């Protein structure tokens, strides 16, 4: 099994599909990008960069110029400064205790919704 491509989260940004991996080995999560979606071809993800989160990534969302990355014990918000390094802009980090958070989505530019696998729903004002 190729653990380097165990995708846990995907998000769409400006015509490109991005994927974040779960980190089984080591501490780094890989960010991959698929620039071209061609139904007649074999599309390949390209490694964009690696980042060390505090835990395994479970979900992500991109909206309002912000990237939300959810792990089992925290939420990371990256403000998109339009540089090549998606994780290089202003960062906000929120720690919490939950059983098994598995999804995140922006409700508006200042609020996200986080959902646990058990169905519990949380709203977080950024």
Locate predicted features.
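Sequence/structural signature of beta-propeller domains
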Residues: 1-126
């Amino acid at each position: 099994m190729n653990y380097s491509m165990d995708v846990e989260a995907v998000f769409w940004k400006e015509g490109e599909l991005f994927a974040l991996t779960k980190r089984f080995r080591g501490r780094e999560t890989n960010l991959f990008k698929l620039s071209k979606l061609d139904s007649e071809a074999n599309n390949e993800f390209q490694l964009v960069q690696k980042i060390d989160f505090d835990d395994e990534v479970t979900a992500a969302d991109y909206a309002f110029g912000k990237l939300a990355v959810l792990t089992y014990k925290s939420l990371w918000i990256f403000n998109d400064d339009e540089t090549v390094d998606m994780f290089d802009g202003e960062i906000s980090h929120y720690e919490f205790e939950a059983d098994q958070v598995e999804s995140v989505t922006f409700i508006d530019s200042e609020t996200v919704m986080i959902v646990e696998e058990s169905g519990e729903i949380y709203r977080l004002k950024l």
